[in-house]
């Protein structure tokens, strides 16, 4: 059970706020702006190399994700996304029958970013390294990985595939169940 699970609605919103502050609002000014996405592209270029597939993927995918996010909440690409906008975006995504375009694009991008070796699996070392780009410390990242990386028998596994990643992603953004393993996917909430 997740430690912050007192009220299901508040718990879900705390996960969304964590995603907002950790993975989107990189300059910590309380807003998501195109600048945050540009900064992330630069960080990936510095860490993985400007000729790497990861940098090229970031340069192609992140502008598309930004455009789809702003479009989903009726904003122009030059606009900003507030925490309130973000919560509203996550709420509407949760109610949607089909996965929204911005979230579909972002989950695909995140899996590619985490799968550094390109073997279509995310192992603990890759996970810990990438979460480090977003300021999540190694100890917390390792602990979180161990909370979701297990097989159907409940045994810890060394890596997760794309299918499991998608299930965990959906749990993170949609589940009010404090025992869902996906609650740990994006780090300690």
Swiss-Prot record:
SUPFAM superfamilies: EF-hand. InterPro entries: EF-hand-dom_pair, EF_Hand_1_Ca_BS, EF_hand_dom. Residues 11-47, 102-137 form the EF-hand domain. Keywords: Calcium, Metal-binding, Repeat. It comes from the Eukaryota. Gene3D superfamilies: EF-hand. The keyword Calcium applies. Ca(2+) 1 binds at residues 25, 27, 29, 36. This is Calexcitin-2. It comes from Caenorhabditis elegans.
């Amino acid at each position: 059970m997740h430690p912050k699970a007192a009220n299901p609605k508040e718990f879900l919103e705390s996960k969304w706020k964590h995603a907002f502050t950790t993975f989107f609002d990189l300059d910590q000014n309380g807003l998501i702006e195109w600048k945050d996405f540009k900064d992330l592209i630069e960080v990936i270029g510095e860490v993985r190399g400007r000729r790497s597939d990861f940098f090229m993927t970031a340069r192609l995918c992140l502008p598309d994700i930004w455009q789809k996010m702003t479009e989903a909440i009726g904003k122009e690409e030059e606009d900003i996304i507030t925490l309130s906008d973000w919560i509203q975006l996550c709420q509407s995504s949760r109610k949607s029958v089909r996965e929204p375009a911005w979230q579909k694009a972002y989950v695909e991008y995140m899996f590619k970013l985490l799968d550094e070796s390109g073997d279509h699996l995310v192992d603990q070392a890759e996970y810990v390294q990438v979460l480090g780009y977003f300021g999540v410390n190694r100890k917390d990242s390792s602990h979180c990985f161990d909370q979701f990386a297990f097989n159907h028998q409940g045994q810890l596994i060394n890596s997760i595939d794309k299918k499991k990643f998608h299930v965990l992603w959906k749990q993170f953004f949609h589940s009010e169940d404090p025992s869902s393993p996906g609650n740990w996917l994006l780090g300690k909430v």
